[in-house]
Amino acid sequence: MWETRVINLFNEVLAALSYDKYPVKNESVLRSLLQVYLIGKNHDVRVEQNNSKGRSDIIVNFTKRRVVLELKYTDKVNEEKNKLDEAEQQIIEKGYGLENLGDRELIQIACVFNGNKNKRQITMYKKVENSVIALV
């Protein structure tokens, strides 16, 4: 699956960083680190892009697809599933990535980063299905 490759790559990038110097302590730090990596790869990256219902964490535009990432942070294993559900619901309710989509494929991914010292990676993710909202 395409989204699995993306998440694995992000986890490799995050694992390569010096955690003492660049600790991921919250969602905004995670978002910034991923943004810097994606910009360094010369991708068209939008962070906190507004639509009429809210702001998506990260949007990456490619020629034939758009990838939307909704990130959640926790440092507790027992919160991961709830955070994943929250991210998925937010993507669906807010319609992230639908604006000016054109004929690109839309890939929406809900992600949970666990900052616990024994984890320090994206531990749960899910490709969001059936979130297309009719635009009138």
Language model features with spans:
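Structural signature of nuclease core domains in nucleic-acid processing machines
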Residues: W2-V136
